[in-house]
Amino acid sequence: MYNTDYKKYNVDIFHPAHFEDIQEESADCGPNVQEVRQFLESNRLEYALQSVLLNPPFGHSEQELKNRAVLLVAEVIHAFRQTDIEESVHKLSNENGDILMKYIYKAMQLCSDSATCLSLLLWHSQLVSKFGQGSIVRVLSNRQRL
């Protein structure tokens, strides 16, 4: 006779939309807030930007942690003068540019302050001018969300 054991599996549970990856949740997930604040207080904005992009909380299940990280990034990029944005964007790698673009889109969703939204749009335009529209496509199509 034929073996029909394979018919006992429910294949619907293997659908990618229902897949939940097991992530290791660690205490050091997200940017180091004290280090970023020290850089901001000493007006070393480029170091603050690099520090805030080092450890994004992708894959973390706690949304409050992700929101705090997004608001911290918004605070850092709002501290830059408009004339310094282009120079700072040109120093970013492709990976950091994509990470920053993810933060910007999430910050646009969370922030309601018009001055912060203006700085977010300025950064967005500079990122698009350096990395092209592919940056937008990579952010929107990536499964790692903030």
Curated annotation (Swiss-Prot):
SUPFAM superfamilies attached to this UniProt entry: Arp2/3 complex 16 kDa subunit ARPC5
GO BP terms, alphabetized: Arp2/3 complex-mediated actin nucleation; cell migration; regulation of actin filament polymerization
GO cellular component assignments: Arp2/3 protein complex; cytoplasm
Entry keyword annotation includes Lipoprotein: no
Any matching Pfam family: P16-Arc
Location in the cell: Cytoplasm, Cytoskeleton
GO MF annotation terms: actin filament binding
Domain of life, per lineage: Eukaryota
Keywords from the named record: Actin-binding, Cytoplasm, Cytoskeleton
Functional summary from the UniProt entry: Functions as a component of the Arp2/3 complex which is involved in regulation of actin polymerization and together with an activating nucleation-promoting factor (NPF) mediates the formation of branched actin networks.
Subunit structure: Component of the Arp2/3 complex composed of ARP2, ARP3, ARPC1B/p41-ARC, ARPC2/p34-ARC, ARPC3/p21-ARC, ARPC4/p20-ARC and ARPC5/p16-ARC.
Record protein name field: Probable actin-related protein 2/3 complex subunit 5
Organism name: Caenorhabditis elegans
Organism taxonomic ancestry: Eukaryota, Metazoa, Ecdysozoa, Nematoda, Chromadorea
